[in-house]
Each structure stands twice: as structure tokens, then as C-alpha cells.
């Protein structure tokens, strides 16, 4: 009982001591100021205009996420397009992400950045890609079936052994002279 009480007191002391050692800047370690967080969902046209100005957008282009309780607030709903689709030859302020300073980022930028999902249109339509894939698989299955039904073997000659075809090792009479075996070389 005394050991358990000492253990609890030791843990409580350690928690109190660690609170005093924590650096003061630990609260702002995320580098997100309160100005960067989305505000409440805009209900009036004036609030929409203020939110559009906050995100450097025109009022006509600004559309917030729906207020469904996910916590998006007044953050603008940007098109679901990856950074691959943006012009690679433009002089971006941040070329790795293809973003300019002050430009709103997509809420799911970590998914749509250049290392992840590429939403660029493909040069071949989806049904053509499926036809090519399943056509190749069907052809390979057909060829495996043909190879199974009609097996092909490498032609071979009879096995050749040295010393007159292993005459003595195969039980030949040592007093007789074995007949000569001609070995062929290719």
C-alpha cells in the first residue's frame, strides 16, 4: 500500500515539475496564428464580402464550404484540382507548391500537392484504359491455356555417358570388349 502511494506521489510530483519546465513558446509551435484560422460561417452578404477580402478573393469567386459542422467556417471552397494542373513555367513565389504569396490554399492541400494525387485529365479515356487492360489479361489467359493444351518441349537426344556408355557400371562383362559408342558433338 505504501509503495503504491509513493508511486502515485512520484507521478504527481513529476507532472508538476514538468509543467514548470515547459518552454513558454510551446503554445505557438504550430506557427498558425489566430488570423490564419477560419472565422465563423458568413451569414450575411457583408460577412461574405469581408471573408472574400480576408482570403484575397473577389466576392463573385468566393464560395465557402457548406456549414455542415465539419469546422470549415468561412474558408473558401476551392476546386478539387491538384497542383500538377497549374502552369509549371509561371514564376511562382513558392515553386515547389506552385503557390503565390497570399493566395488561399486548398483545405486538403496535403492531398492535392504534387507528390500525391494528380487530378490532371488523362490523355486516354477511362473505358479505353479498361479495354486495354482487360484485353491484355484475356490475351495472356488465352496464351496460357494454349500452352497448357499444346505443350512444347525442347527436342533432346538420348543421354550420352562417357566410358562406352558406362559399360562396366551398368553391369557389363569386364572380360569382353564393349562395342564402340559414337558420341555426337554439336
From Swiss-Prot:
- Binding partners and assembly: Complex I is composed of 45 different subunits.
What keywords are assigned to this protein?
Electron transport, Membrane, Mitochondrion, Mitochondrion inner membrane, Respiratory chain, Transit peptide, Transmembrane, Transmembrane helix, Transport
**Membrane topology qualifier:** Single-pass membrane protein
Q: Which PANTHER family match?
A: NADH DEHYDROGENASE [UBIQUINONE] 1 BETA SUBCOMPLEX SUBUNIT 8, MITOCHONDRIAL, NADH-UBIQUINONE OXIDOREDUCTASE ASHI SUBUNIT
Pfam families assigned to the protein according to its UniProt record, in alphabetical order: NDUF_B8
Major localization class: mitochondrion
Per the UniProt entry, the disulfide pairs are none
Matching InterPro entries: NDUFB8, Ndufb8_metazoa
The free-text function statement in the UniProt record for this protein reads: Accessory subunit of the mitochondrial membrane respiratory chain NADH dehydrogenase (Complex I), that is believed not to be involved in catalysis. Complex I functions in the transfer of electrons from NADH to the respiratory chain. The immediate electron acceptor for the enzyme is believed to be ubiquinone.
What gene is it encoded by? NDUFB8
Q: Where in the cell is it found?
A: Mitochondrion inner membrane
| Residue span of the annotated presequence | 1-28
The major lineage groups are: Eukaryota, Metazoa, Chordata, Craniata, Vertebrata
Looking at the keywords, is Transferase present? Answer: no
Instruction: Name the chain's protein.
Output: NADH dehydrogenase [ubiquinone] 1 beta subcomplex subunit 8, mitochondrial
Q: Which organism is it from?
A: Gorilla gorilla gorilla (Western lowland gorilla)
Q: Name one GO biological process term.
A: mitochondrial electron transport, NADH to ubiquinone
- Highest taxon of source: Eukaryota
Family from the record: Belongs to the complex I NDUFB8 subunit family.
Task: Quote a single Gene Ontology cellular component term.
Answer: respiratory chain complex I
Report TM segments. Answer: 133-153
Amino acid at each position: 500500500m505504501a509503495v503504491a502511494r509513493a508511486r502515485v506521489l512520484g507521478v504527481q510530483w513529476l507532472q508538476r515539475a514538468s509543467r514548470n519546465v515547459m518552454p513558454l513558446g510551446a503554445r505557438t509551435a504550430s506557427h498558425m496564428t489566430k488570423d490564419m484560422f477560419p472565422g465563423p460561417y458568413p451569414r450575411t452578404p457583408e460577412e461574405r464580402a469581408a471573408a472574400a477580402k480576408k482570403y484575397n478573393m473577389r466576392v463573385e469567386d468566393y464560395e465557402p464550404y457548406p456549414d455542415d459542422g465539419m469546422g470549415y467556417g468561412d474558408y473558401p471552397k476551392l476546386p478539387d484540382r491538384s497542383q500538377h494542373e497549374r502552369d509549371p513555367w509561371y514564376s511562382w513565389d513558392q515553386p515547389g507548391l506552385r503557390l503565390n504569396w497570399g493566395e488561399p490554399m486548398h483545405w486538403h492541400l496535403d492531398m492535392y500537392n504534387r507528390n500525391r494525387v494528380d487530378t490532371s485529365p488523362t490523355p486516354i479515356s477511362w473505358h479505353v484504359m479498361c479495354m486495354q487492360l482487360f484485353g491484355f489479361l484475356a490475351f495472356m489467359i488465352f496464351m496460357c491455356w494454349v500452352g497448357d493444351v499444346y505443350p512444347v518441349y525442347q527436342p533432346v537426344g538420348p543421354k550420352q555417358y562417357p566410358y562406352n556408355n558406362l559399360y562396366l557400371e551398368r553391369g557389363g562383362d569386364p572380360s569382353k570388349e564393349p562395342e564402340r559408342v559414337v558420341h555426337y558433338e554439336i
